[in-house]
Amino acid sequence: MGKKIISLAMFLALFLLFLNDPAAPQVYRYKDKNGVVHFTDTPPDDKFTRVQNERFRSTQFPYYGNNLLIEMASNRLELVSQAVVGVKTNSTRGTAFLINPLGHAITNYHVIAEAGGDIQAVTFDGQEWNAWVISTDPDKDLALIQIGGGKYPYLPLGKLTDASIGKEVYIVGNPLGLSHSMSRGIVSSVRKGMNKNTPLTLIQTDAAINAGNSGGPLITPEGLVLGVVTFKAGTPNLPVQGIGFAVSSEDIISGLSLTPAKESPGPNSSKQ
């Protein structure tokens, strides 16, 4: 065991050294005028890069806040991560995602149910903000919270028709405290049911779900939210892999009031 720990430590040290080495090789991906994708260690010319950046920033994904983060984001999925926040209470850890620039975010009810008014949200840039509950739907395990601070990046909600069987999907969250981690899978099934006489639609996926993912978004490659990650199947005596569920985006819309006109009153301070 000791040798394994030492080997892992050496690997991580070398990996971090490589990341911080200015001489480490860079790989660029670009598309030529014929639509052919190329990979090269030589950066494309400035004119091409400028056009590509303008096209990328004109996509439907809305963004507000630190422009530096826009420059750092290399693809749409990285931008998606910037609209995901960690949620901390006295007793739980989970995830939430922003749905408008005012700081309104969706999470699971069970993540904030016992918070007692003490909720902290950790944004992509590492800042910690006070947050408070706006509305809840316990039967659908949903909650709308308000995060203090300025304008935020946010995610658009998709439709249930976007959740076709076999479609590639991603989960962004804070599994085991590893902030803004992403896992990948497919839509395995779409299941309709009832919870305490409340209609509920669950999207089944084989993307990895672990403690801390609760409340995070299940998203398409285009950055549309298909659902809110809620739970994974399993029992203490029967380990189960690759069966997780997210409450559908349609349940988000029907279960919570998502159109507050103004910023809600409450604490508005960073606890960086």
Which residues make up each language-model segment?
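Active-site region of chymotrypsin-like
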Residues: 80-91, 146-156, 181-260, 266
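Conserved active-site neighborhood of the chymotrypsin/trypsin-like protease fold
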Residues: 81-173, 177-180, 199, 262-265
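A short acidic/small-residue loop/turn micro-motif
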Residues: 43-47, 113-114, 136, 233-234
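N-terminal activation segment of mature serine protease catalytic domains
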Residues: 31-36, 55-98, 255-272
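Short, cationic interaction patches enriched in Lys/Arg with P/S/T/G and frequent prolines
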Residues: 2-6, 18-69
